[in-house]
Amino acid sequence: MGRGKVELKRIENKISRQVTFAKRRNGLLKKAYELSVLCDAEVALIIFSTRGRLFEFSTSSCMYKTLERYRSCNYNLNSCEASAALETELSNYQEYLKLKTRVEFLQTTQRNLLGEDLVPLSLKELEQLENQIEISLMNIRSSKNQQLLDQVFELKRKEQQLQDANKDLKRKIQETSGENMLHISCQDVGPSGHASEANQEFLHHAICDPSLHIGYQAYMDHLNQ
């Protein structure tokens, strides 16, 4: 029995899709190689995976030569427009290769900084990596110390604000105590409507000497007994 015709559609399962891509890609690259050998054909094959990874095959020493040859061919298109479009394509492709190389380098550097893939590195490269890590640690410590200093400065500023508020509160309490003392002394008068000589003398000393404010209440309690 012959095999039924398989419907071509996107494979929904991610793992199956990746496995199929790998198999079909390898088969396509193999077919391109066989075509170039058996038929002495110039073949160029470019494949991008869903993740943007590049796979390519070229029978010439450089893919650019084949693309340049492709550019020179005219498929019933305006030669100037086709040339400009292809030049843009080639420019974008070269830019992509540069970015791809840069990304791979950064990924390798990141793994090295994390202590991975260190076996291929030479002694000089390991020393350079060590210096980079030490510089990074110095920057981290400097940033941490600066944040600690900022926190200490903020705490001192808040402490000074509390001290100023405490002084202001003490001053207001002292002013209120002085006013209450004067009010009480005005009420302590004799039958004639005048304060006694003893009270007048004490009041005079109390006003002149704030240190007597504390004993004034005890003195008034003694007179009322």
From Swiss-Prot:
It is found in: Nucleus. SUPFAM superfamilies: SRF-like. GO terms for cellular component: nucleus. May interact with the K-box of MADS6. This is MADS-box transcription factor 5. It comes from Oryza sativa subsp. japonica (Rice). Expressed in anthers. Weakly expressed in carpels. One of its GO terms (biological process) is flower development. Residues 89-179 form the K-box domain. One of its GO terms (molecular function) is RNA polymerase II cis-regulatory region sequence-specific DNA binding. PANTHER family: SERUM RESPONSE FACTOR HOMOLOG. Gene3D superfamilies: Transcription factor, MADS-box. Probable transcription factor. May be involved in the control of flowering time. Keywords: Developmental protein, Differentiation, DNA-binding, Flowering, Nucleus, Transcription, Transcription regulation.
